[in-house]
């Protein structure tokens, strides 16, 4: 998400975590991307889905980011993508101890389904992508500590609604958040809830 991707200096979350823990941290955040796959036609060869969390994890597992390097995104806010993807391709994932996955706001914006009634590992759904991510990472890196971070509470000025009111097709944002929290608990995976617990959001003045 851009919450992480657009802040890459000493004030970034990765930099703060590195300062506090002494661990070497890398910010692999890519703004505007989704956790699950989003192509409406479900084309596995759709290259933009390779920068989703599900697509990136597949590359972590096979240790090959070649597909991501073919993605061409023209928006100026994504000018750091090329360098970030190049850096990810140089990381020795066998040495990675902790992986934070903070995503989901764009799944909500896209109206992606939360769950599939047919395939629990359907990566075109929010929960299916989480299950697939956890399964693949645990199979490839059994000692890796996986920590999900929920989307934050969000206001919209056009229309003037909060995420509690704004349904973009898949439900309100809290539906995604609660599904993520419940699923992570069921999978015995850590999750940090920044939707409910991070900052006050009772009134518009809190914005």
Residue ranges and their predicted role:
Residues 24-29, 97-102, 145-150, 190-193:
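Structural recognition of the beta-strand scaffold that forms the well-ordered cores
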Residues 1-50:
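Serine-esterase "nucleophile elbow" of acetyl-processing enzymes
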Residues 8-12, 120-128, 167-174:
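Soluble non-cytosolic domains of exported or imported proteins
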Residues 2-5, 30-35, 105-110, 152-156, ...:
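Solvent-exposed loop/turn segments at secondary-structure junctions
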Residues 130-134, 177:
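Generic structural signal for well-ordered alpha-helices
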Residues 100-112, 134-173:
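Active-site segments of SGNH/GDSL-like serine hydrolases
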């Amino acid at each position: 998400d851009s919450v992480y991707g657009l802040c890459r200096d000493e004030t970034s979350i990765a930099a703060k975590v590195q300062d506090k823990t002494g661990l070497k941290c890398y910010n692999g955040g890519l703004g505007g991307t989704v956790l699950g796959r989003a192509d409406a036609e479900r084309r596995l060869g759709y290259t933009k889905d390779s920068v989703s969390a599900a697509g990136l994890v597949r590359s972590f597992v096979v240790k090959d980011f070649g597909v991501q390097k073919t993605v061409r995104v023209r928006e100026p806010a994504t000018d750091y993508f090329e360098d970030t993807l190049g850096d990810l391709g140089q990381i020795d994932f066998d040495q990675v101890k902790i992986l934070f996955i903070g995503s989901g706001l764009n799944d909500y914006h896209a109206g992606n389904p939360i769950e599939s009634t047919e395939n629990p590992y359907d990566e075109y759904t929010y929960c299916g992508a989480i299950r697939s991510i956890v399964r693949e990472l645990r199979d490839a890196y059994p000692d890796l500590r996986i920590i999900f971070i929920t989307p934050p509470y969000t206001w919209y000025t056009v229309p003037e609604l909060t995420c509690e009111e704004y349904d973009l097709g898949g439900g309100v944002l809290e539906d995604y958040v609660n599904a993520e929290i419940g699923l992570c608990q069921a999978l015995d995976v850590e999750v940090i809830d920044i939707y409910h617990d991070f900052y006050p959001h009772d009134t518009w003045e809190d914005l």
